[in-house]
Regions:
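Catalytic alpha/beta core domains of metabolic enzymes, predominantly
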Residues: 1-79
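Conserved short secondary-structure transition element at the edge of the structured enzyme core
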Residues: 30-34, 72-104
Length: 104
């Protein structure tokens, strides 16, 4: 909830580090004072997520926004089912042994 993040950031300032837990809200959260992201997308495209955050911290917001938009199709694919099923599948397809999903 971006409104809640804005309120917390305004109240706490630098006393609290805020991280995005939603890949589709990285740049908006960073713009509100966020420090980074806990990302599902970074499991299959770490450079893309890193470059998006780095561009923002380098004050290249146009590039950060472009990279945020570049992540959207991947986000949609990785959230077509509940996490971690799609991301583990994608990692296995990429040749990274993420193992099988286990039953709860």
């Amino acid at each position: 909830n971006i409104s809640q993040v804005a309120k917390v950031a305004a109240l706490c300032g630098d006393a609290l580090n805020i991280y995005s837990g939603n890949d589709d809200q990285v740049v908006p959260l960073l713009a509100l004072g966020g420090k980074g992201v806990i990302s599902v997308v970074s499991n299959v495209a770490p450079e893309l997520v890193h470059n998006c955050c780095q561009a923002f911290f380098d004050r290249d917001t146009a590039k950060a926004c472009a990279l945020q938009l570049e992540m959207l199709p991947l986000e949609e694919a990785l959230f077509c089912e509940v996490n971690p099923i799609p991301v583990k599948y994608a990692m296995n397809v990429l040749g990274w042994n993420a193992g099988e999903c286990r039953l709860p």
